[in-house]
């Protein structure tokens, strides 16, 4: 895509990102540019998965990766696409010791026209920069990074799977690479991007609902914390709770917050409730962006689609377990589901809360809304329905 065209598109999509007090303003004048991108092609290309081969999430990687290094004296070095390889890190690397690291996750889809498109990557770039500033990691130009990612996908375009529900998962990462045991702002950092061909979250056209453990003794995030940033430190501590959920016969965790047991997230997904509110109005509601939950790209997309339809009320506000239990008792709940890049939309059919199993009638109701969201998203992502959410590679 020509630079001028990319700039026009970006101008329509760009969201403001406020400075934090610790934001590394010293880095603003130092940006890497896609025009300086260096490309080194692999001499040992891997065998690509067969079309019939099952693609497990995050297990298969493409031939190349994007790498950009930064230090506080020279700023950003030139970006380079190079053969996929292991990293060499100092044993005292601050990204390993103090979780000074963040990541993103987005997908590229191959349409029936064989055109590859990224789904709303501008939102991922915005979120990535917000996360970087929260950790005092160096700033970068979102437009330039997106163009570098586009060129990386173009180099490995033959890895983009062509099949129903398949995609190329894109994982940008930014880590502090300080070779010191001191805790503070880094003087070295590393940004890299790797690619994974992935299959459908739900095999075929099936849609398997999940059961949730809702235990208020476990907390994922809190007001004033970093729950709204995509940091590695938000994910590692959830593994033990996920294991506890499995011990209790549940697939995922419903994260609660506060003394009133507010619904926040499902596993690593945002959560939605489709119900008739106590005021008698049909409504789709999801928790607000108050700093506790991650501002998901699919979350925003579902809200945008629902508001475009104009068929029911769409709300972003606090929802408590007390409200959900009452609505279930009164038969007002239609569907409960999670949303995220991996699954798009995932139905919920059961919640274990305070020692009792709460049945959610999601599947008995179609799930009508979930299937509609899935259909609309798929049409947009695979190019059957033209939409300015998609960024052509």
UniProtKB/Swiss-Prot annotation:
Pfam families: Aminotran_4 (PF01063). Keywords: Acetylation, Amino-acid biosynthesis, Aminotransferase, Branched-chain amino acid biosynthesis, Lipid metabolism, Mitochondrion, Pyridoxal phosphate, Transferase, Transit peptide. It is found in: Mitochondrion. Catalyzes the first reaction in the catabolism of the essential branched chain amino acids leucine, isoleucine, and valine. May also function as a transporter of branched chain alpha-keto acids. Substrate binds at residue 169. This is Branched-chain-amino-acid aminotransferase, mitochondrial. Belongs to the class-IV pyridoxal-phosphate-dependent aminotransferase family. GO terms for molecular function: branched-chain-amino-acid transaminase activity; L-isoleucine-2-oxoglutarate transaminase activity; L-leucine-2-oxoglutarate transaminase activity; L-valine-2-oxoglutarate transaminase activity. GO terms for biological process: amino acid biosynthetic process; branched-chain amino acid biosynthetic process; branched-chain amino acid catabolic process; branched-chain amino acid metabolic process; cellular response to leukemia inhibitory factor; isoleucine catabolic process; isoleucine metabolic process; L-leucine metabolic process. The gene is Bcat2. The lineage of its organism: Eukaryota, Metazoa, Chordata, Craniata, Vertebrata. Its EC number is 2.6.1.42. One of its GO terms (cellular component) is mitochondrion. Homodimer. The modification N6-(pyridoxal phosphate)lysine is found at residue 230. Residues 1-27 form a transit peptide. Its cofactor is pyridoxal 5'-phosphate. Gene3D superfamilies: 3.30.470.10, D-amino Acid Aminotransferase, subunit A, domain 2. The modification N6-acetyllysine is found at residue 322. The keyword Lipid metabolism applies. It catalyses: L-leucine + 2-oxoglutarate = 4-methyl-2-oxopentanoate + L-glutamate; L-isoleucine + 2-oxoglutarate = (S)-3-methyl-2-oxopentanoate + L-glutamate; L-valine + 2-oxoglutarate = 3-methyl-2-oxobutanoate + L-glutamate.
